[in-house]
């Protein structure tokens, strides 16, 4: 299995609900360890740059407005098949279509306020991680499992 890194964002609705720890715990329980974490308020320019791929889509303005409406938690998660595992833990983009036990099914309210973002491919993960975290800010470490 390949050890990968992926970007995960706890969106403003997740921060506002006070579930940061619960979300990080779900990733850790499934073998994804955070190797970089930052709580920040995205600027309009940062959000527009990050979501530039959606610029022509009708929801772009609302997405940028939402992502700048409050603090977010930016994380780099590391583990075996991190991209696919992260997406499995998050669940479908639309919480109504997400499987039971996923973050979006359990915490999200709708497709716009769906609590978390995760990279959709290994290629995009590299781009997204580098957008928010220069390599120097990412710290590798080994887990010591509790007995």
Curated annotation (Swiss-Prot):
Top-level taxon of origin: Bacteria
Localization: Cytoplasm
Enzyme class: transferase
Binding site for ATP: 11, 59, 87, 93, 104, 114
UniProt-listed InterPro entries: NDK-like_dom, NDK-like_dom_sf, Nucleoside_diP_kinase
EC number: 2.7.4.6
Any Pfam family the entry gives: NDK
Catalytically driven reaction(s): a 2'-deoxyribonucleoside 5'-diphosphate + ATP = a 2'-deoxyribonucleoside 5'-triphosphate + ADP; a ribonucleoside 5'-diphosphate + ATP = a ribonucleoside 5'-triphosphate + ADP
An example Gene Ontology biological process: GTP biosynthetic process
Cofactor dependency: Mg(2+)
GO molecular function, a single term: ATP binding
UniProt entry keywords in alphabetical sequence: ATP-binding, Cytoplasm, Kinase, Magnesium, Metal-binding, Nucleotide metabolism, Nucleotide-binding, Phosphoprotein, Transferase
UniProt xrefs under SMART domains: NDK
GO cellular component, one term: cytoplasm
Active site: 117 (pros-phosphohistidine intermediate)
Physiological role: Major role in the synthesis of nucleoside triphosphates other than ATP. The ATP gamma phosphate is transferred to the NDP beta phosphate via a ping-pong mechanism, using a phosphorylated active-site intermediate.
Quaternary data: Homotetramer.
Stated family: Belongs to the NDK family.
Name of this protein: Nucleoside diphosphate kinase
Species in which this protein is naturally found: Anaeromyxobacter sp. (strain K)
Lineage: Bacteria, Pseudomonadati, Myxococcota, Myxococcia, Myxococcales
């Amino acid at each position: 299995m390949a050890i990968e890194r992926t970007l995960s964002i706890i969106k403003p609705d997740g921060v506002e609900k006070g579930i940061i720890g619960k979300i990080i715990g779900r990733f850790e329980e499934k073998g994804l360890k955070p190797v970089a974490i930052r709580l920040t308020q995205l600027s309009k320019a940062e959000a527009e740059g990050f979501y530039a791929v959606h610029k022509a889509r009708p929801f772009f303005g609302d997405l940028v407005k939402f992502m700048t409406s409050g603090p977010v938690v930016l994380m780099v998660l590391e583990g075996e098949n991190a991209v696919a595992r992260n997406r499995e833990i998050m669940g479908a983009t639309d919480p109504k279509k997400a499987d039971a036990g996923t973050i979006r099914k359990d915490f999200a309210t709708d497709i716009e306020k769906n609590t978390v973002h995760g990279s959709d491919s290994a290629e995009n993960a590299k781009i997204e991680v580098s957008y928010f975290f220069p390599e120097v800010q990412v710290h590798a470490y080994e887990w010591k499992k509790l007995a």
